[in-house]
């Protein structure tokens, strides 16, 4: 866990060290949102750029006509997962044997979009959408997603594509019953849920978000409604919690859970990472409220 306030930075660890990396799950979407907004600011893409301008989607139906902005705000009409991924079969492998359901290459992901239908442009959380967004932005930058992440947000974030890419510092995650789970590695999933980080790297990110120096900061600013009382920027969620405006995202993989939240008015933020598949949302909100109250 890490806490950043206007006056201090704190880190607490149990069962890990400063070099240990965690799967941050869907917090990866928050980083991808920042890469997207940074690319807009640099003139590489615009909010109206469509996928078909950046990825080889000719003959793939409606997918190529989806805009990057609609992907960033989960309003693209894309499903959560592509039907060509055979999600039921993969889900069974995950639940029964703890397998990684997301080991695809980018080429494999694009192949799976052939049968995708684009629905109404209403809020719908989509892993597929953020996978495509991240790789499209990387293509606009003339880079891979992994390289773009390193170039813009720092080389401390890793995106292992294979189990062989993992090292001793990369923790093994466990389900809530203590069963070790296969790591969620894969080229395709990186922008939506495949990033690894240490707690110190996440603390540094938190500081840069609070002081406004991080590239792609505008990703945190809500530009649309996700639900009637919840705003969304480029992945980042903003809501009222006990009278305070909180900007946050969480993450969950087969063996890890994560949470990052900021009370921007109080200049305070919290990150929680754990190598167990058990939600830490409640703890994250509670700790943030406690430290933000002290900071005010």
Language-model-detected regions and their locations in the chain:
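Catalytic loop of the DD-peptidase/beta-lactamase superfamily, centered on the K-T-G motif
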Residues: 1-13, 19-23, 28, 83, ...
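Mid-domain, small-residue-enriched loop/turn segments at the edges of structured enzyme/sensor domains
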Residues: 67, 126-129, 160-173, 177, ...
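Residues at helix-coil transition
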Residues: 41, 73, 111, 154, ...
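Well-ordered alpha-helical segments within folded domains of soluble proteins
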Residues: 32-33, 129-134, 200-204
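Secretory-pathway/luminal and periplasmic proteins that interact with or process carbohydrate-rich
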Residues: 10, 58-66, 77-83, 155-165, ...
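Active-site-proximal loop and beta-strand segments within enzyme catalytic domains
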Residues: 5, 16-127, 143, 175-180
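Short, well-structured active-site flanking segments
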Residues: 38-56, 65, 140-167, 214-222
């Amino acid at each position: 866990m890490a806490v950043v306030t206007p006056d201090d930075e704190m880190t607490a660890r149990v069962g890990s060290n400063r070099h240990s990396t965690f799967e941050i799950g869907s917090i990866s979407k928050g980083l991808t949102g920042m890469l997207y907004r940074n690319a807009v600011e640099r003139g590489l893409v615009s909010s109206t750029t469509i996928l078909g301008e950046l990825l080889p989607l000719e003959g793939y139906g409606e997918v190529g006509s989806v805009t990057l902005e609609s992907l960033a705000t989960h309003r693209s009409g894309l499903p959560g997962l592509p039907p060509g991924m055979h999600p039921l079969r993969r889900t069974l492998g995950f639940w029964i044997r703890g397998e990684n359901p997301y080991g695809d290459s980018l080429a494999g992901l694009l192949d799976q979009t052939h049968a995708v239908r684009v629905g109404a442009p209403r809020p719908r959380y989509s892993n597929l959408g953020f996978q495509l967004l991240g790789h499209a932005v990387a293509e606009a930058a003339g880079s891979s997603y992994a390289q773009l992440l390193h170039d813009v947000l720092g080389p401390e974030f890793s995106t292992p594509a294979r189990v062989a890419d993992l090292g001793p510092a990369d923790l093994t995650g466990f389900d809530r019953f203590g069963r070790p789970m296969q790591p969620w590695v894969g080229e395709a999933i990186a922008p939506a849920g495949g990033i690894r980080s240490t707690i110190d790297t996440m603390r540094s990110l938190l500081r840069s978000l609070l002081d406004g120096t991080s590239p792609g900061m505008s990703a945190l600013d809500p530009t649309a409604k996700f639900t009637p009382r919840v705003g969304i920027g480029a992945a980042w969620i903003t809501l009222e919690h006990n009278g305070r405006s909180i900007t946050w995202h969480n993450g969950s993989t087969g063996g890890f859970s994560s949470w990052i939240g900021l009370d921007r008015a109080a200049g305070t933020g919290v990150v929680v990472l754990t190598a167990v598949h058990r939600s830490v949302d409640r703890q994250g909100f509670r700790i943030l409220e406690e430290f933000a109250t002290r900071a005010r």
